[in-house]
Amino acid sequence: MSSHGNSLFLRESGQRLGRVGWLQRLQESLQQRALRTRLRLQTMTLEHVLRFLRRNAFILLTVSAVVIGVSLAFALRPYQLTYRQIKYFSFPGELLMRMLQMLVLPLIVSSLVTGMASLDNKATGRMGMRAAVYYMVTTIIAVFIGILMVTIIHPGKGSKEGLHREGRIETIPTADAFMDLIRNMFPPNLVEACFKQFKTQYSTRVVTRTMVRTENGSEPGASMPPPFSVENGTSFLENVTRALGTLQEMLSFEETVPVPGSANGINALGLVVFSVAFGLVIGGMKHKGRVLRDFFDSLNEAIMRLVGIIIWYAPVGILFLIAGKILEMEDMAVLGGQLGMYTLTVIVGLFLHAGIVLPLIYFLVTHRNPFPFIGGMLQALITAMGTSSSSATLPITFRCLEEGLGVDRRITRFVLPVGATVNMDGTALYEALAAIFIAQVNNYELNLGQITTISITATAASVGAAGIPQAGLVTMVIVLTSVGLPTEDITLIIAVDWFLDRLRTMTNVLGDSIGAAVIEHLSQRELELQEAELTLPSLGKPYKSLMAQEKGASRGRGGNESAM
C-alpha cells in the first residue's frame, strides 16, 4: 500500500468515526494505531533507535536492574550468606534509600508551600475538594475489592496451626492510635517534627486502695452505738473494743496508663498541614509574600536538580535492594501453601485496583488512553517496588510527572505530597483483606456489621499509615482491635509482608500519580485563570513564562515520539 493510499484510508476512517458506534470506533482506532506502527517500523533508522534509547535510558536501566537483582539473588541463595554478609551486600541499596529520604523533607515543604502560594484560596479550595473526593472514592473502592477477593477466594480456610509466626506486634488501643494521628497533625515543635512523631507509650503504676471491713461483716459506715449509752447498759470500754474490731485491708494492683512518647521518623502529616496553611497565607499576602514565594520556589527547583543527579544511581540501588531482600528470606517455601493463597489473593486484589480501576477512572475523566501514562510512570513504580516507601519515591514521582508527562507543576506540588501522606489505596486494600484472612484462619464468622466496621476502620487507618516501609502492619492493629480479632495473629503474615509491601507501595504511587492527572484535567479552568492573572517567580522568571517553556518542551518531546 502506497503512502497516498494509507493517508486516504486514515482520512476516510476518520470521517466515519462520528457515525458508527463506540465499539467500531475503538476497532478502527486500533487499526490506525497498528498502521502507524507498521509505517514507523518500515522507516526506522539507527538514529531513531539511538534516540529511543537515550529518551528511555532511565526506564531501561531500572527494568534491567530489577531483572539482574532477582537473578543475582537466586544465584547467591545456595551459598547461604550470613546476615552480616547480606547487609554488606545490600549496602549500595541502603545508600539509595538514604539519598531519597534526605530529599523528602525539603521536597514536601517547598513543593506544598509553592503550590499553595501560587493559587488563590478559591482555586485551592476546589482542587482540595476534588483531591479529597478522589482519595476517598479510590480508597473505598480498594477496601471493597480487598473484602470481595478474600471472601470469594477464601484463603484462610483450614487451620492456623500450620502457619509460622514471626516477630512481635505491639498492641495499641484504637482510641489512642486515632488521637495520635490528630496530635501529629499539629506538632508543637516544627524542628522536632522533622525527625520525630508523637506516639503514645504505656507504663505501669501501682495503685493502692484501702478497703474497710468489720469483724461481723457489717458494711463500712454502718451505725455504731455511742461510746456510752445508759439505755443499752454498755460501757465506754466495751464500745472501744468493738470499734477496734474494724479491719483495714490494703489492696494493691498494677494499672497501665498512657504517657506521652515519640517515635523516630519524619512527622509528614504535621509538616503537610503546616506547609499547606503557610502556603495559603503567603498566597494571600500578594506582593508582600513575593520574597518567600521566590525562596521556596528556588528551593524546590534546587531539590529537583538534585533528584536529576541521584536518579542515575537509582538502578544500582534498586538492584541491591531487591537482591538483598530476597537473600534475607530464610525459607522461600512460605510463599506456597496457605500463605501462598493469601499472597495470591492480595496480588489479584492489587492488580484489579491498579490495573483496571485506576486506569478506568483516568479514562472516564480525561478520555485518554491510560496505559501510555502508566508507561511514563514506570521508573517511579519500579523505584517504589525497590524502596518499599511512597515517601522515598516522591522525588522520582515528581520527575516522572512534571518532566516526563508534562503535568502542571502547580498540581503536582499540591497533590503529590498530600497523596504520599494520606492516600494509601494499596494499604487500605491490604488491611481489609488481611483482617478477614485472620478471621478465617481462626474460624471466626464475621457478620455484615463487623465487615462494615473493618471497611470504615481500614479506610481511616490507611490515612494514618505514613509512607514508610511496613507501616501497614502497625495500623492493622487498629483494624483487628475494632472487631475483636487477636492482634498477635499479625505475626502469621509477616513472612510474606516484605513482598506484598512492595506491591501495595506501587499501587499507592500509581494512585497518587493518576490522581494528579485527574485533578489537573478537572482544574483546567482554574489553572488557565491563574496563568493569566498570577505571576510566580521561578529562579527570577515569571511563572507564566516558565509554563510556556515547559509546554514547548512537552510538545518537543511529543514530536520526537511521533518521529519514532
Swiss-Prot record:
It is a multi-pass membrane protein. Na(+) 2 binds at residue 421. L-aspartate binds at residues 388-390, 427, 468-472, 501, 508. Na(+) 1 binds at residues 419, 423, 508, 512. Gene3D superfamilies: Sodium:dicarboxylate symporter. Brain, mainly in the cerebellum. Expressed densely and selectively in cell bodies of Purkinje cells. It catalyses: K(+)(in) + L-glutamate(out) + 3 Na(+)(out) + H(+)(out) = K(+)(out) + L-glutamate(in) + 3 Na(+)(in) + H(+)(in); K(+)(in) + L-aspartate(out) + 3 Na(+)(out) + H(+)(out) = K(+)(out) + L-aspartate(in) + 3 Na(+)(in) + H(+)(in); D-aspartate(out) + K(+)(in) + 3 Na(+)(out) + H(+)(out) = D-aspartate(in) + K(+)(out) + 3 Na(+)(in) + H(+)(in). It is found in: Cell membrane. Keywords: Amino-acid transport, Cell membrane, Chloride, Glycoprotein, Membrane, Metal-binding, Phosphoprotein, Potassium, Sodium, Symport, Transmembrane, Transmembrane helix, Transport. The keyword Translocase does not apply. GO terms for biological process: aspartate transmembrane transport; chemical synaptic transmission; establishment of localization in cell; L-aspartate import across plasma membrane; L-glutamate import across plasma membrane; L-glutamate transmembrane transport; monoatomic ion transport; neurotransmitter transport. Residues 371-401, 451-484 dip into the membrane without crossing it. Its main location: membrane. The chain crosses the membrane at residues 56-76, 99-119, 133-153, 262-285, 295-322, 344-365, 411-437, 498-519. Residues 1-55 are cytoplasmic. GO terms for cellular component: glutamatergic synapse; Golgi apparatus; intermediate filament cytoskeleton; membrane; membrane protein complex; plasma membrane; presynaptic membrane. Belongs to the dicarboxylate/amino acid:cation symporter (DAACS) (TC 2.A.23) family. SLC1A6 subfamily. Contains eight transmembrane regions plus two helical hairpins that dip into the membrane. These helical hairpin structures play an important role in the transport process. The first enters the membrane from the cytoplasmic side, the second one from the extracellular side. During the transport cycle, the regions involved in amino acid transport, and especially the helical hairpins, move vertically by about 15-18 Angstroms, alternating between exposure to the aqueous phase and reinsertion in the lipid bilayer. In contrast, the regions involved in trimerization do not move. This is Excitatory amino acid transporter 4. It comes from Homo sapiens. The gene is SLC1A6.
